[in-house]
């Protein structure tokens, strides 16, 4: 793929998501989703490997099915109510179909099976776009229509996502699959709190995207996709290893890192609404996520072989070039917890 083609695809991604975010008409919103879907497929096949082509086909079939269901629900709602406005969903059947379609686009359980498979077959940068930028449009739609959606369905999808995302990530050795199940669990947190405090979903999504982009950038810089090479990284790139450890702990929600803030605020909001059972379940699922993050950290630190390095300088491969934005991303993803009172005020 030529650089010009890549630039066009990235611009189409930006255009499609922007169209969805700024639309109040179901047809324009659906067009934005389709532009984003069609634009990312060439990026998924960037390496021209059979696995990447397979993942692109899986992604296309899943997203096409979800788009078909979403358009059917919007058309049914228009037929029943006579308008295409995004905020006015008066039909229960349309509301239910829209919820399932958006859950399929987000990768919420039980529609999550495509996420780890597609991510495993794609490159690190394509996977980063899938888990960050491609979540903006579906989350924004749920954010806008959440008052009209069925709360019981949303709660079921959210809790099952946090449980399955944490449980299935326990036995993974591929870093991309670990990040996929982490994304499923985080999406469950966001969809759950959107029922009670939608603004908190925006904060949660922002911090999640920040940490995920930083982590994928480190993986791409060090060219690591499995947990086994992490045991050799400490001698080659100690700064990168430290960055991976801090970012994983932040994603796991361990204080005093940035990722603790959204989990703290979500559980606090659930307790305010006298939903102690839900808060307890979320806290337990957060421990599941933290456990498989700790397994990766264990592989990168405590399984290091005793090696003697007689050189003054650490060895780096030719592909190891530190992006200028990486230090900023790592710092923001790990040190923003003291700003939590400001987050609460803004919310």
Curated annotation (Swiss-Prot):
The keyword Membrane applies. Pfam families: NADH_dehy_S2_C, Proton_antipo_M. GO terms for biological process: mitochondrial electron transport, NADH to ubiquinone; mitochondrial respiratory chain complex I assembly; reactive oxygen species metabolic process. It is a multi-pass membrane protein. The lineage of its organism: Eukaryota, Metazoa, Chordata, Craniata, Vertebrata. GO terms for molecular function: NADH dehydrogenase (ubiquinone) activity. Disulfide bonds: none annotated. It is found in: Mitochondrion inner membrane. Keywords: Electron transport, Membrane, Mitochondrion, Mitochondrion inner membrane, NAD, Respiratory chain, Translocase, Transmembrane, Transmembrane helix, Transport, Ubiquinone. The keyword DNA damage does not apply. InterPro entries: Complex_I_Subunit_2, NADH_DH_su2_C, NADH_UbQ_OxRdtase_chain2, ND/Mrp_TM. It catalyses: a ubiquinone + NADH + 5 H(+)(in) = a ubiquinol + NAD(+) + 4 H(+)(out). Its EC number is 7.1.1.2. GO terms for cellular component: mitochondrial inner membrane; respiratory chain complex I. The gene is MT-ND2. It comes from Ornithorhynchus anatinus (Duckbill platypus). Core subunit of the mitochondrial membrane respiratory chain NADH dehydrogenase (Complex I) which catalyzes electron transfer from NADH through the respiratory chain, using ubiquinone as an electron acceptor. Essential for the catalytic activity and assembly of complex I. It comes from the Eukaryota. The chain crosses the membrane at residues 1-21, 26-46, 56-76, 96-116, 153-171, 178-198, 199-219, 237-257, 277-297, 326-346. Belongs to the complex I subunit 2 family. Its main location: mitochondrion. This is NADH-ubiquinone oxidoreductase chain 2. Core subunit of respiratory chain NADH dehydrogenase (Complex I) which is composed of 45 different subunits. Interacts with TMEM242.
């Amino acid at each position: 793929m030529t650089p010009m083609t890549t630039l066009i695809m990235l611009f189409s991604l930006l255009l499609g998501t922007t169209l969805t975010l700024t639309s109040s008409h179901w047809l324009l919103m659906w067009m934005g989703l389709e532009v984003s879907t069609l634009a990312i497929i060439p990026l998924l096949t960037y390496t021209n490997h059979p696995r990447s082509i397979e993942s692109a086909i899986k992604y296309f079939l899943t997203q096409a099915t979800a788009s078909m269901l979403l358009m059917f629900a919007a058309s049914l709602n228009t037929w029943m109510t006579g308008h295409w406005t995004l905020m006015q969903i008066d039909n229960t059947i349309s509301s239910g179909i829209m919820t399932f379609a958006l859950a399929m686009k987000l990768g919420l359980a039980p529609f999550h099976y495509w996420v780890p498979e597609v991510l495993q077959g794609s490159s690190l940068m394509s996977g980063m776009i899938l888990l960050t930028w491609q979540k903006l449009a579906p989350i924004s739609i749920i954010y806008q229509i959440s008052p009209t959606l069925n709360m019981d369905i949303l709660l079921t999808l959210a809790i099952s996502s946090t449980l399955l995302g944490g449980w299935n990530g326990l036995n993974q050795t591929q870093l991309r699959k670990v990040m996929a199940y982490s994304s499923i669990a985080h999406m469950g947190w966001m969809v759950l709190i959107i029922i009670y405090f939608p603004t908190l979903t925006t904060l949660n999504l922002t911090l999640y995207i920040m940490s995920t982009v930083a982590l994928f950038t480190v993986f791409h810089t060090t060219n690591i996709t499995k947990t086994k090479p992490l045991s050799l990284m400490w001698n080659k790139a100690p700064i990168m290893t430290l960055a991976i450890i801090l970012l994983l702990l932040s994603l796991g929600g361990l204080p005093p890192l940035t990722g603790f803030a959204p989990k703290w605020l979500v559980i606090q909001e659930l307790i305010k609404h006298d939903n102690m059972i839900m808060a307890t379940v979320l806290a337990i699922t957060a421990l599941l996520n933290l456990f498989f993050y700790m397994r990766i950290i264990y592989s990168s630190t405590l399984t290091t072989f005793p090696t003697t390095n007689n050189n003054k300088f650490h060895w780096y491969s030719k592909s190891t070039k530190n992006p200028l934005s990486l230090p900023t991303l790592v710092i923001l993803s790990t040190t923003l917890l003291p700003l939590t009172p400001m987050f609460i005020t803004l919310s």
